[in-house]
């Protein structure tokens, strides 16, 4: 995005928006808001950094708060997977403070480097945005790539020395809750975060086709997935009932309760293919397999 595309220093952001609207009537409202932001800021690195960090905080805490209310008010208690382990407000608050500190000390510096990195690899910030179809298929690819990275790196983090040095912090809560999705050591945040940010960057480096707006939509969906997977609630309308290969809260809750298996983030296929599922069905299948081998 060329921040000097429109006249400089129009006054307020909304005055800049009006100017953009006059010169770019073909753009939709979101595209005009986007263009006005970069033009008004007059500093693309600062514009991207502020927008990225604010978006992350609003989405993360905005999505976590409903789960806090559900836990605190006892709503949907019948759907709580480990209903004897309801997190207290104190636990939620302590978790929130830890996560917020991590956001400012670990994630914020990386976010400020995002725009220079995006420019280096050719990510676009211009308008108009890509088509909905383009964003959909790219985000679907990112879900698959991130899930693959997450499975193998997460499984590696359960190796004894790495677990004790890095991953143990995340398993402080054996009954997870939404806010705890990013409750992790700085090293783990960077390792697993690579799947969310690094995979799309690599995609762009290989194809030369990726818009930062697509990245934002992807990150929002990934945050929703991570928070919901840690929510600790299994509903009749949970997504995996309609997409059997989707992981969901029931899949990840067992991982926190048993400290083993179910290493994937979004999908179930890696755990199934590599026999690391930890579900009643998988355990039964393993027992039957052992009995069959003994009988032979």
UniProtKB/Swiss-Prot annotation:
Family matches, as Pfam families: FA_hydroxylase (PF04116)
Transmembrane as UniProt keyword: yes
One BP term from GO: ergosterol biosynthetic process
Subcellular location: Endoplasmic reticulum membrane
EC number: 1.14.18.-
Motif segment (Histidine box-1): 154-158
Phenotype seen when the gene is deleted: Leads to the accumulation of 4-methyl fecosterol and 4,4-dimethyl fecosterol.
Pathway annotation from the record: Steroid metabolism; ergosterol biosynthesis
Keywords assigned: Endoplasmic reticulum, Lipid biosynthesis, Lipid metabolism, Membrane, Oxidoreductase, Steroid biosynthesis, Steroid metabolism, Sterol biosynthesis, Sterol metabolism, Transmembrane, Transmembrane helix
Keyword Lipid metabolism carried by entry: yes
Superkingdom: Eukaryota
Fatty acid hydroxylase domain span: 140-276
Residue intervals passing through the bilayer: 50-70, 98-118, 125-145, 201-221
Residue window of motif Histidine box-3: 251-257
UniProt main location, coarse: endoplasmic reticulum
Similarity section: Belongs to the sterol desaturase family.
Domain remark from Swiss-Prot or TrEMBL: The histidine box domains may contain the active site and/or be involved in metal ion binding.
Cited function: Sterol-C4-methyl oxidase; part of the third module of ergosterol biosynthesis pathway that includes the late steps of the pathway. The third module or late pathway involves the ergosterol synthesis itself through consecutive reactions that mainly occur in the endoplasmic reticulum (ER) membrane.
Comment field (misc): In Aspergillus, the biosynthesis pathway of the sterol precursors leading to the prevalent sterol ergosterol differs from yeast. The ring system of lanosterol in S.cerevisiae is firstly demethylised in three enzymatic steps leading to the intermediate zymosterol and secondly a methyl group is added to zymosterol by the sterol 24-C-methyltransferase to form fecosterol. In Aspergillus, lanosterol is firstly transmethylated by the sterol 24-C-methyltransferase leading to the intermediate eburicol and secondly demethylated in three steps to form fecosterol.
Protein name as catalogued: Methylsterol monooxygenase erg25B
UniProt source species: Aspergillus fumigatus (strain ATCC MYA-4609 / CBS 101355 / FGSC A1100 / Af293)
Upper classification of the organism: Eukaryota, Fungi, Dikarya, Ascomycota, Pezizomycotina
Gene that encodes the chain: erg25B
């Amino acid at each position: 995005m060329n921040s000097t595309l429109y006249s400089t220093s129009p006054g307020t952001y909304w005055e800049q928006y009006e100017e953009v609207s006059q010169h770019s009537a073909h753009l939709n409202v979101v595209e005009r808001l986007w263009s006005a932001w970069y033009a008004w800021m007059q500093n693309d690195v600062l514009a991207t950094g502020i927008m990225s960090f604010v978006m992350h905080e609003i989405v993360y805490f905005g999505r976590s708060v409903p789960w806090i209310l559900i836990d605190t008010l006892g709503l949907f208690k019948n759907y709580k997977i480990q209903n004897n382990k309801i997190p207290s407000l104190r636990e939620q608050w302590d978790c929130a403070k830890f996560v917020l500190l991590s956001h400012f000390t670990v994630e914020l510096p990386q976010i400020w480097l995002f725009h220079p990195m995006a420019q280096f690899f050719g990510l676009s910030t211009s308008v108009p945005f890509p088509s909905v179809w383009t964003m959909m298929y790219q985000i679907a690819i990112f879900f698959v790539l991130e899930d693959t990275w997450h499975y193998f790196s997460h499984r590696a983090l359960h190796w004894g020395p790495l677990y004790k040095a890095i991953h143990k912090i995340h398993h402080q809560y054996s009954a997870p809750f939404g806010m705890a999705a990013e409750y992790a050591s700085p090293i783990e945040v960077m390792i697993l975060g690579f799947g969310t940010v690094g995979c799309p960057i690599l995609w762009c480096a290989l194809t030369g086709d990726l818009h930062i707006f697509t990245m934002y939509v992807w990150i929002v969906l990934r945050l929703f997935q991570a928070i919901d997977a840690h929510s600790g609630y299994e509903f009749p309308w949970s997504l995996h009932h309609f997409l059997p290969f989707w992981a969901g809260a029931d899949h990840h809750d067992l991982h926190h309760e048993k400290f083993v298996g179910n290493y994937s983030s979004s999908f179930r296929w890696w755990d199934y293919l590599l026999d690391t599922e930890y579900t009643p069905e998988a355990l039964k299948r393993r027992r039957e397999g052992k009995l069959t081998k003994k009988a032979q």
